[in-house]
Amino acid sequence: VRDAYIAQNYNCVYTCFKDAHCNDLCTKNGASSGYCQWAGKYGNACWCYALPDNVPIRIPGKCHRK
């Protein structure tokens, strides 16, 4: 498990405005909790605590949105 920005397909973060949205997203993916980090490295993005290793996280490199 790790603490990280949860990622969508193509290495893109989940943007957010409310902590509750991120907490729900993170816990549904097996994390202990999560919150919306404002003005972070990737803008306003969901950060998860104790996210399982099988869930994708944001890694260095570009977000490749289609």
UniProtKB/Swiss-Prot annotation:
One GO BP annotation of this record: defense response
Disulfide bond annotation, renumbered to this chain: C12-C63, C16-C36, C22-C46, C26-C48
GO MF entry, a single one: sodium channel inhibitor activity
Record has Disulfide bond as a keyword: yes
Localization terms from the record: Secreted
PROSITE patterns, per database record: LCN_CSAB
Tissue specificity of this protein: Expressed by the venom gland.
InterPro entries: LCN-type_CS_alpha_beta_dom, Scorpion_toxin-like, Scorpion_toxin-like_sf, Scorpion_toxinL, Scorpion_toxinL/defensin
Keywords: Disulfide bond, Ion channel impairing toxin, Neurotoxin, Secreted, Toxin, Voltage-gated sodium channel impairing toxin
Notes concerning its domains: Has the structural arrangement of an alpha-helix connected to antiparallel beta-sheets by disulfide bonds (CS-alpha/beta).
Name of the protein in question: Toxin Boma6c
Native source species: Buthus occitanus mardochei
